Regions:
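A non-catalytic structural micro-motif
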Residues: 95-104, 119-150, 163-172
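Bacterial N-terminal signal peptides that target proteins for export
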Residues: 1-8
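Periplasmic peptidoglycan-binding/tethering modules of Gram-negative envelope proteins
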Residues: 21-98, 172
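A generic structural micro-feature
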Residues: 157-161
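C-terminal motif of bacterial Sec signal peptides marking the signal peptidase cleavage site
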Residues: 16-19
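Short beta-alpha junctions and helix-cap segments that line functional grooves
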Residues: 151-155
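Extracytoplasmic/secreted proteins, especially bacterial periplasmic and envelope-associated proteins
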Residues: 79-86, 112, 116, 120-124, ...
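Pyridoxal 5′-phosphate
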Residues: 10-13
Length: 172
């Protein structure tokens, strides 16, 4: 196969993947009771990433919408386990809610590898949500690989911000 054919085939596959993706809608804000004013700041976790049962009841932990990963890893960090339990509880309590898990990677590695890594990261978050009682029918995993960086500098600090899954609540 010559280079031109390979390039055309890769472009065709990318076009097909983009054409098959769903349009993501922005989620409505988290519901709060009418007589309760929204909190101005997130309460400090009691230990590294842990929330108290009261936090789970007030949805304070739902503010964690970005899950970060280590370099070239798709394993969920322990500090995000409580956030997974909180989001799963939200999904259980609201069966009509839907969530898109947007997997991302830093710029290191090939485009194809990073697309796969972003998908594996999204699937890891999906599995954690399901293990905590979330329904697979409420979850949609999308991988953007290295295509949607939040930081464009070439530094470890910046790359760490790009190795993530973003949780987006979507309309039904």
């Amino acid at each position: 196969m010559n280079n031109t054919t390979r390039i055309l085939l890769a472009a065709l596959m990318c076009t097909a993947a983009v054409a098959c993706s769903k349009k993501v809608k922005e989620a409505p804000p988290v519901e709060t009771p009418v007589n309760q004013a929204p909190a101005a700041t997130e309460p400090a976790p009691t230990t590294a990433g842990a929330y108290t049962p009261a936090d789970l009841d007030t949805d304070a932990c739902l503010r964690t919408r970005v899950i970060y990963f280590d370099f070239d890893q798709d394993a969920l960090r322990p500090e995000f386990q409580q956030a997974m339990a909180c989001h799963a509880k939200y999904l259980r309590d609201r069966p009509s809610s839907r969530m898109t898990l947007e997997g991302n990677a830093d710029e290191r590695g090939s485009r194809e590898y990073n697309m796969g890594l972003g998908e594996r990261r999204g699937n890891a978050v999906s599995s954690a949500l399901q293990a905590n009682g979330g329904s697979a029918s409420q979850l949609n995993v999308v991988s953007y690989g290295e295509e949607r960086p939040t930081c464009t500098e070439s530094s470890e600090d910046c790359w760490g911000k790009n190795r993530r899954v973003e949780i987006v609540y979507t309309a039904k």
